[in-house]
């Protein structure tokens, strides 16, 4: 068990928020009898390739049907997945607790001790963890064997050490540009000693960041687009289509209220100022230690048929992740004036991190 991400953290659950209730929770077999007996009309099967039992959402796309005035009506019987938020238990060749930074309560430095809460959640999830860990260990063993056979294996701990030693590069547009180029050109790239790009092609960088961010917003289904809970506890949603972004707010009844449109090309890529850069570097270091981030890189390598060296895949993925985040920061500033300082970067992370944790991975969240 690895608790390093939550050591020293305090986490609260703001009463006005309710953002986690926009996520449709799975109902485990042992939880099903309560809902089947008392609320059978609110038990549903999800759509998709791997359907599961879940609680219904208001109008099929809003918050959970049990959320009323931002309070849960079945709080004492809420599902395991509701209880776990904002903690994510990731199974690889070990279990690592990761903290969802889209939860505003993770930023205030008040509330309950995160390690104590995590340990209680892990104890409650022991049967599921045992099975998930057994399966994920085998997946990782097979993945590493495939990497070695293809000649693309590198020591993950060394990759992490390199990023840790050079984290500031991933918060600098000149270095990001260079790293992204090298990751696609060099057989096995190295970032130690590289120099930043001095003649930046801003049009290409803006296009890269825009495409990354808009890809996640390209759905007309509110369940499939990023959600940003702002400081006033509004559930903001952004949908991209035909080169435009629509900003809407989901209300407590499950209806979308239109706020504004913007042509995506009119949103210019901005970079954090000195204070914002510090927050961004901290986030890079957080991602660098997450097993789920490493697992998402491994998933990309597997989908690409083990063509790229693990070094290029890892450094390149970190760089494009930051580009996505920077463009989202720029978009929030365009619509809401959040800025590019420490607060602006924090708001962008709050907007982004849940999607980051939802990225495909070879491991599993328990």
Task: Show where each model-derived region lies.
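Short loop/turn segments that flank or connect secondary-structure elements
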Residues: 1-19, 24-62, 66-71, 76-366
